Amino acid sequence: MEMYETLGKVGEGSYGTVMKCKHKDTGRIVAIKIFYEKPEKSVNKIATREIKFLKQFRHENLVNLIEVFRQKKKIHLVFEFIDHTVLDELQHYCHGLESKRLRKYLFQILRAIEYLHNNNIIHRDIKPENILVSQSGITKLCDFGFARTLAAPGDVYTDYVATRWYRAPELVLKDTSYGKPVDIWALGCMIIEMATGHPFLPSSSDLDLLHKIVLKVGNLTPHLHNIFSKSPIFAGVVLPQVQHPKTARKKYPKLNGLLADIVHACLQIDPAERTSSTDLLRHDYFTRDGFIEKFIPELRAKLLQEAKVNSFIKPKENFKENEPVRDEKKSVFTNTLLYGNPSLYGKEVDRDKRAKELKVRVIKAKGGKGDVPDQKKPEYEGDHRQQGTADDTQPSSLDKKPSVLELTNPLNPSENSDGVKEDPHAGGCMIMPPINLTSSNLLAANLSSNLSHPNSRLTERTKKRRTSSQTIGQTLSNSRQEDTGPTQVQTEKGAFNERTGQNDQISSGNKRKLNFPKCDRKEFHFPELPFTVQAKEMKGMEVKQIKVLKRESKKTDSSKIPTLLSMDPNQEKQEGGDGDCEGKNLKRNRFFFSR
């Protein structure tokens, strides 16, 4: 109840209270039925039964259940708010409803009863208080606390149901083998009250009601009279024998001809002789002068208008005795005038709209001007992207969480199966984030190269080394000799060891900083990195080598300075081989540096 603001009390009954409330976030006015906290199991049974039926059956002439929750051990049912009933109409029109209004109301009430009976449901409490009337004139049947399915042959029902004034004779005599005709009897009593403004069988006890039934409707059948004679409640009571008119119009003179025929078909003492709701809808009272053909479009327009205004949220089930929502969707039975069920307008329709809007946004994001351009990714990343795309096309992804995160960076495949984007800085990240292509030190990189083909980079590095070596040879060409070959080899080995040691320090330092989990280390996929940084480092090391050679040239004779241009080709190939090994070590260290 924290989400709702109480505005007042609407009604109160033997099983609970109905409050008028306002949703604090949306401002929607709702009616909340609060069941009393009683030790009897009957209260929970009635609440559970009403929840079950309202979840399972939806119709435009049945009240809509919005939400169910339990607070302080009390069950709360949230309904659409309609504060007007047929009883309020009768209090306003003391002499009964006008004929046009009465026919429209009865047509909708019969449609609701027919829908329930076609699904083998008995309401068992039809009365003016349980017929809601909206501002546009749409009637909705409510209060399903006594509703239940038809029993199998041999099963029995509860004997004390329905309000006394509208109770059929088999219910008064506590016959447990009743069925749909009890609703038809209650409808007949209510029709007379709606037409005249006065209840037809007001009574203070079951005996009083039974006496009035015999006087106004007819004598008991042999089966019912046998139950009456054996009942200890009516022991010693003798019912009168009354002669009644045979025609309906003489029996109910206050009603017009066709309406009297409907009431006479409903109020039959024998349940087997009572008419059905389907036959009543086909009666001349509704089919004459094209009433149905004219009223159906009007009713459809009113339903569409109310559906736009009252787009209710689908109930969030917090009641432990409720069935799962997935099972509910399979068992919902509808019978509507619309192309869809107006009772289901709400979260399901909003979810479909969000799905369509999401598709439009995805199309716009792919074809817009501000998109990130597509780049060539390694093959293993392409596989992950295709798999993620296939997963996103499943309907369950839209039902659970729309993958809006894909629009921000469509090139980033670091998303789990639920469409939730993972933190790229977390230790469990599966793939490194993309490289910023605008960095100044990456302008010379080849973005289309692959990690599986490092030969091109080694070739470029070898060319750079040769170019720098030739520069050294041109500078010192007048003072080189072949005698000091071992000295030059030792110098190069020292420089190589120095570079390797520096790279090892850099890689070990990066290992300590990153501190990735061991279990995830083998599953990292590293993106393509250029070779520019290492090329610059090697260039700096060669400059240092030049300075060392210059200092040695000043101390030694010119005859002892080696010449790089006149080196042996075999020795150059050997150095190239060492360079390849060196390049592999640098490549391995570069991976740790990139991490």
Swiss-Prot record:
GO biological process: dendrite extension; negative regulation of axon extension; positive regulation of dendrite morphogenesis
Domain Protein kinase: 4-286
Enzyme Commission number(s): 2.7.11.22
Phosphotyrosine sites (modified residues): 160
Entries under Pfam families matching the protein: Pkinase
SMART domains to which the protein is assigned, alphabetical: S_TKc (SM00220)
A single GO cellular-component term on record: nucleus
SUPFAM superfamilies: Protein kinase-like (PK-like)
Active site: 125
Biased composition, class Basic and acidic residues, residue ranges: 368-386, 570-585
UniProt enzyme class: transferase
Keyword set includes Acetylation: no
Name listed for the protein in its UniProt record: Cyclin-dependent kinase-like 3
Organism: Mus musculus
Gene that produces this protein: Cdkl3
